[in-house]
Amino acid sequence: LTSIFYKKCTKKMTSDCSENIFVYMFDDVEVNRTCCLELVQMGEACHFALVENVFSSPVYKANANSGLLRSRNLWNQCAILADEYD
């Protein structure tokens, strides 16, 4: 993950939505519609690059399996929601 790509990805989402989605990967919280739409607008490549970066950290590595699954499910749910808004 190049630092330029990473920086561009992080700028594509508000800090509130970034926090909401981060917490979702570890806990049963709801991701609101606004954040879902921001996620899809950010793009799949950015989302999964950022998620992979989180779970490559020793601090979060133990939660990688469930977190990666939750992030994939979230992406799919948000993509469906975004299609409904097109």
PLM regions: where:
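Mature extracellular/luminal domains of secreted and GPI-anchored eukaryotic proteins, especially small
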Residues: 1-86
